[in-house]
């Protein structure tokens, strides 16, 4: 996202640079190891979830200036949904539409997961607030919003470094990303102006977070950042 703003002398900005979500680290058979999931090549086989990416924000105490939504975490067989140009988060994606979790709208997080969820991912946070808490430690935790300083959600217990691989595992990225579940679990939604959804069961990839622009000449592209991490760049045009 890109825009032009008029800022006055002594304006103090809060800037959040979104972080990528964590890889799955759970390995089959409970091996104790310090190797990464990529080095082992076992976590994808076990279908554990991954963390959703965090959104990037610039705001002050009275105004929200701009937001770039984070992408959802990938799952076995499905890529996470990119951060969106528009304001709303997207739904999770996976082979069974019954287990899709809806993205948030209007600055709110992805929809709450219900008690019948089996290894759900954590929903992405929105500007207005964070989502619901996970329903058990095997699930991914929701990402935090501004009141909790945008901390990414925790990973499911066995996907957090307790069952092979280094901690903290499949955590959500800083900027409100949701954490990935353990075992055959779903991945986290991306944080953003509105949060991405997370699936309720296996092989659900996370939805992307929404974006926002409150300035002049706004422009943006869905999935427009090819880098792993978010970025906030401020260029002074004139005094």
Predicted regions and their residues:
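Extracellular (secreted or membrane-anchored) zinc-dependent metallopeptidases
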Residues: 205-210, 214-227, 235-237
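Short Gly/Pro-enriched turn/cap motifs at secondary-structure boundaries
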Residues: 46-49, 183-184, 222-224
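Secretome/extracellular-domain signature
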Residues: 1-138
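Short, structured beta-strand segments at or near domain termini in extracellular proteins/domains
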Residues: 56, 67, 226-239
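Extracellular trypsin-like serine protease catalytic domains
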Residues: 137-187, 191-205, 211-215
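Conserved "cap/hinge" positions at secondary-structure junctions
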Residues: 17-19, 197, 236
């Amino acid at each position: 996202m890109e825009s032009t703003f008029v800022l006055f002398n002594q304006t103090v900005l809060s800037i959040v640079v979104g972080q990528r979500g964590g890889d799955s680290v759970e390995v089959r058979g409970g091996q104790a190891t310090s190797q990464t999931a990529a080095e082992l090549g076992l976590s994808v086989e076990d279908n554990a979830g991954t963390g959703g990416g965090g959104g990037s924000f610039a705001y002050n105490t009275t105004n929200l200036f701009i937001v770039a939504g984070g992408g959802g975490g990938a799952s076995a067989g499905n890529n996470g949904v990119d951060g969106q140009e528009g304001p709303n988060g997207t739904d999770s994606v996976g082979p069974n539409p019954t287990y899709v979790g809806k993205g948030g709208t209007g600055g709110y997080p992805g929809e709450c997961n219900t008690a019948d969820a089996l290894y759900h991912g954590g929903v992405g946070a929105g500007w207005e607030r964070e989502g619901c808490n996970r329903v058990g430690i095997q699930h991914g935790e929701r990402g935090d919003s501004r009141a909790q300083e945008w901390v990414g959600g925790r990973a499911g217990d066995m996907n957090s470094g307790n069952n092979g691989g280094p901690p903290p595992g499949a955590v959500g990225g800083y900027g409100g990303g949701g954490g990935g579940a353990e075992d055959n679990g779903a991945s986290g939604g991306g944080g953003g102006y509105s949060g991405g959804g997370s699936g309720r069961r296996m092989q659900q990839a996370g939805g992307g977070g929404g974006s926002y622009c409150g300035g002049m000449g706004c422009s943006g592209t869905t999935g427009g950042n090819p880098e792993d991490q978010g970025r906030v760049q401020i260029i002074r045009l004139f005094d």
